[in-house]
Amino acid sequence: ESDATPEMQALAEKLSPMITAHSDEVYMNLALFNRIKAVHDNAGQLGLTPVQRRLTEKYYKRFVRNGALLSAADQDTLKSINTRLAALQLSFVNNVMSEIANNYVVVDNADRLSGLPKTTIDAAAKLAADKGMAGKWVFTPSASTRLAVLTSADDRSLREEMYKTYMATANRGNEFDNSKNINAILKLRQQKAKLLGFKTFADYAIDPVMAKTVDAAENLLLSIWKPAVKKVDEEVADMQKYADAHGAGYKIEAWDYYYFAEKVKAE
């Protein structure tokens, strides 16, 4: 987020297609792949150490996953998909960064700053002055500012504003809305997965990791889901007890979680 300057964004837009094209040229270089394949196919006769075998397998699979075994026509299709994906993913990130910089919470009453760290308050005052709002405080939903507000702000309405501002990032129907980017990325990822012999992009993404299959990964997640939810419910119950005991007078909501988690932890 700290690098989200117009200059850095312009540089990323210039370099992204170059980096993508270079990567494709490496992974779809037939002469280079054939050398890797020769070592891979004859690993048993070459006296490779376990580490060398592992490295050979790793690079062989990486090249295959990036289109080394595709026909020339399919490689051209994959290159086109990769180029479009790179542009869309960069647009997605730029939209998020632009939203973080331009969608913010303005505070004009110092009483609402209770509980916030001085560094956060000072930074918000400077940002407000930079935006022509001297005497006020501007809080963006950047990670450091957002967490400071959600964790420390005694003003519940400020926590709620910050939470909702963050949750609406790049999803407000304006020029930075990422809905179209997301839909286009999903379609292209599916095309890429099928081109490389996978049923879905999830299957493609999970293939090189320990779980190996989408079902295995889903089963793993579901196995920890119930105990995780139970633990969170217990934590929220403790927070609610603390809130009730200190006269909060409301039910704990998402924007209250970090604040009361810190209060309970400090007891």
Summary of predicted features, one role per range:
Residues L55, R84-A87, N94, S98-T140, ...:
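Active-site-proximal, well-structured secondary-structure segments within enzyme catalytic domains
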Residues D130-T169, Y257, E262-V264:
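Active-site-adjacent "gating/activation" loops or surface patches in catalytic cores
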Residues E7, L11, L70-A73, D154, ...:
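Catalytic cores of large soluble enzymes that bind and process phosphate-bearing ligands
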Residues P50-R54, A153-R156, N183:
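Alpha-helix N-cap/helix-start motif at coil-to-helix transitions, marked by capping-box chemistry
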Residues K58, R62-I81, T169-Y204, K212-E218:
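A conserved hydrophobic secondary-structure block that centers on an alpha-helix together
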Residues D41-V51, T145-T151, N171-D177:
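A ubiquitous short alpha-helical element
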Residues E1-K118, A123:
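N-terminal helix-rich structural modules
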